[in-house]
Curated annotation (Swiss-Prot):
Protein name, per record: Cyclic dipurine nucleotide synthase
Encoding gene (name): cdnE01
Domain of life, per lineage: Bacteria
Gene3D superfamilies named in the record: Beta Polymerase, domain 2
Organism classification: Bacteria, Pseudomonadati, Bacteroidota, Flavobacteriia, Flavobacteriales
Cofactor(s) listed in the protein's UniProt record: Mg(2+)
Leader peptide range in chain numbering: none
Cited function: Cyclic nucleotide synthase (second messenger synthase) of a CBASS antivirus system. CBASS (cyclic oligonucleotide-based antiphage signaling system) provides immunity against bacteriophage. The CD-NTase protein synthesizes cyclic nucleotides in response to infection; these serve as specific second messenger signals. The signals activate a diverse range of effectors, leading to bacterial cell death and thus abortive phage infection. A type I-A(GA) CBASS system.
Source organism: Elizabethkingia meningoseptica
Keyword Lyase: no
UniProt GO BP: defense response to virus; nucleotide metabolic process
Amino acid sequence: MNFSEQQLINWSRPVSTTEDLKCQNAITQITAALRAKFGNRVTIFLQGSYRNNTNVRQNSDVDIVMRYDDAFYPDLQRLSESDKAIYNAQRTYSGYNFDELKADTEEALRNVFTTSVERKNKCIQVNGNSNRITADVIPCFVLKRFSTLQSVEAEGIKFYSDDNKEIISFPEQHYSNGTEKTNQTYRLYKRMVRILKVVNYRLIDDGEIADNLVSSFFIECLVYNVPNNQFISGNYTQTLRNVIVKIYEDMKNNADYTEVNRLFWLFSNRSPRTRQDALGFMQKCWNYLGYQ
């Protein structure tokens, strides 16, 4: 093993208090700018590594979701064809579309942050400065996944990239399920995620892997699917070994993994990630850490 137990413990810790303060400053300032435009028609919350408390790199971006609550997209895939026809015959349209929402969001942010604002493919970016970190603001609508005509199975968010790709996610379920997993594993779930993210950055810096081989989201999902009994209280070295071995063996056996939200399969047509990506990453982590 190339690294001591204490080194793994150090890697498992979240970002510093200073970084957390800069994150809070960004959230407060951006929330005020959005409220000035949209009032209480929106819900504003975090998603991603900062929200899930798995961030490890200094000066990382924070993802701020602005969900417009006065309209929603329906997901009718689980309804019968006859129920879909009934729903579509009765539905009404809000008259406010996503292109307008993103444009209004950009305008609201430019009114406050002026030249610090950049429109990106999937978000509006507010660049950081000495007292706030860079933030990606994601305007979106509510998504309602219907299980029957009268029942909503789950609520998430939906938006479109500027190149017209539909994006659906369930950040609230991701957060709550990840927190539950952490509480059930002696708080080791998120700590193992942080360690693997540190190793990922080191492998990228050393030129061992491409910088887009695995995302933070992908790492969180892989570790989430490791059974709770593989997380050993007070033993980071053994737990990390268990996690890497379990994921590697599962990928060789084509195991079905879910996203942390438990509402999508991890390996599906909606995701560019493959089991081969996970296999390759686990092998690189094993070699880098020096397990035998």
